[in-house]
Amino acid sequence: MTGKPVQVVAAGGIYNGRTVAAALMLGASAVWVGTRFILTDEAGAPKAHQEAVRTAGHDDNIRTIIFTGRPLRVRNNKYIENWEENRAAEIKELTAKGVIPVEHDFEILGDEIDDETMDNARPFLMGKAAAVVNEKKSAKAVVDELVTDAVKCIHNGERMTAKL
């Protein structure tokens, strides 16, 4: 609409130099790295959140709307699983009225809410990359590694160019 080139920022699954290089080679102007930075020394994430990311496997996170009414990918647990598998119609009904499902639970349970429900009703946000992010580093080390490895991948790709 401005006549200027559109800038594309790639996001989702960006966690190492190979994924940065792939996004750039596919035409992205930049990348957005999310989950990888949860497991850094400087992250403001609580230790429990960092541990949830560090120990996540490929099937340990789920996309849900129970926390905000908008899709989030979070570490799965029995509380979330119960909503998604047994209370899907209730999610639809509540969100159609603008009611956040988790807040609805808190209102209904009131002072009767138990510690386990409280603990499991806390979302540990993470993307699919959490399954391969398992080492805590400084943010600088992460950025340095992303850039260094991306440059290596791009240079390796240049060597593969056919000479016509």
Question: What annotation goes with each model-predicted range?
Answer:
Residues 1-9, 14-164:
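Conserved active-site-proximal phosphate/metal-binding subdomains
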